[in-house]
Amino acid sequence: MIIQTPSRIHMGLIDLNGSIGRVDGGIGLALEEPNIKIEGKESDDISIEFDKKLIEKYGEDYIKSVRDRVYNTAIKVLDVIGGEGVDLKILSLFPAHSGLGSGTQLSLAVGKLISKIYNKEMNAYNIAKITGRGGTSGIGIGAFEYGGFLIDGGHSFGKGKDKEDFRPSSASKGVKPAPIIFRHDFDWETILIIPKGEHVYGKKEVDIFKKYCPVPLNEVEKICHLVLMKMMPAVVEKNLDDFGEVINKLQYLGFKKVELSLQSDIVKDLINELHKDVYAGLSSFGPTIYAFGDKKLIVEKANDIFDKYGVYGEIIITKANNVGHKIW
């Protein structure tokens, strides 16, 4: 049995002010590529194998970290469903801490595959609770389960509520995944640009939330206005210019403004250059940039910036995944 999951771009957290009694609220999009693909079958114990090309591409350190995550997820899920073991082979991956949601997709893929193998199927929300994913944004879980363009409703906020302070998903164990409140198929081609930039995670990520939150309420109100009255209608009415204009404006509002300010010069330079002619944003903390518009122009601009800084960067031309994970 094989499972394939999408990646996702995270376009922003709507409310990290919290004065209304809710926080977070994510905006995102599931993508066909890059993806995670895992093959599995029932076994007496747990074994984890990797396609040789992945070891060559990502190196031993990253492969070890993936192996550890896969093993820990498998242990938790097998314990819940009463299974003995599983043989897993990782066929495709994408980098961690790059803004594409690899941690959530990997955990959900392993959990879902094991539950299917043992005919004790669980949905993504059950698996997320077991594995501790989705504590800030529900976009990764929604991308896995449904695909498409997604907005989640965040969490209740305050003493005795879902969340009592500002923190990222990685530090939000035990918090239930945010509900998906809007989902729609997405038709436009998406270009990913992955330059050499800052990778934000762990304690550094927690400290950023502590330092920069709450964000100003007036900026949260602007984000809500743009998302509800321009971005969502643009997706439904297939108006790329309206959608893209919101993407460009979101880079300089709320917590996204913080995320972009902490990125390297090449990332900031790339976004500034792209904004002259097309639509582009930083996915999560980055360094991945997503862009919409003239594909040829986007690729040319990205390569020009790579040349300017003398660095290698990856460009992926992809499209939305409108169905979520696939199993065969």
Curated annotation (Swiss-Prot):
Taxonomic source organism: Methanocaldococcus jannaschii (strain ATCC 43067 / DSM 2661 / JAL-1 / JCM 10045 / NBRC 100440) (Methanococcus jannaschii)
Cofactor: Mg(2+)
NCBIfam families, sorted: beta_RFAP_syn (TIGR00144), BetaRFA-P_synth (NF040726)
InterPro entries on file: Beta-RFA-P_synthase, GHMP_kinase_N_dom, RFAP_synthase, Ribosomal_Su5_D2-typ_SF, Ribsml_uS5_D2-typ_fold_subgr
Pfam families for this protein: GHMP_kinases_N
Catalytic activity: 5-phospho-alpha-D-ribose 1-diphosphate + 4-hydroxybenzoate + H(+) = 4-(beta-D-ribofuranosyl)phenol 5'-phosphate + CO2 + diphosphate; 4-aminobenzoate + 5-phospho-alpha-D-ribose 1-diphosphate + H(+) = 4-(beta-D-ribofuranosyl)aminobenzene 5'-phosphate + CO2 + diphosphate
Pathway: Cofactor biosynthesis; 5,6,7,8-tetrahydromethanopterin biosynthesis
Gene3D superfamilies (alphabetical): 3.30.230.10
Its job: Catalyzes the condensation of 4-hydroxybenzoate (HB) with 5-phospho-alpha-D-ribose 1-diphosphate (PRPP) to produce beta-ribofuranosylphenol 5'-phosphate (beta-RFH-P). Also catalyzes the condensation of 4-aminobenzoate (pABA) with PRPP to produce beta-ribofuranosylaminobenzene 5'-phosphate (beta-RFA-P). Only 4-hydroxybenzoate is known to be biosynthesized by methanogenic archaea, but 4-aminobenzoate can be used as substrate by growing methanogens when it is present in the growth medium.
EC number of this enzyme: 2.4.2.54
GO MF annotations, alphabetized: ATP binding; beta-ribofuranosylaminobenzene 5'-phosphate synthase activity
pH-linked activity: Optimum pH is 4.9.
Superkingdom, natural source: Archaea
Subunit record text: Homodimer.
Protein's name according to its UniProt entry: Beta-ribofuranosylphenol 5'-phosphate synthase
Family affiliation: Belongs to the beta-RFA-P synthase family.
Keywords: Glycosyltransferase, Magnesium, Transferase
Remaining remarks: Lacks any chromogenic cofactor, and the presence of pyridoxal phosphate and the mechanistically related pyruvoyl cofactors has been strictly excluded.
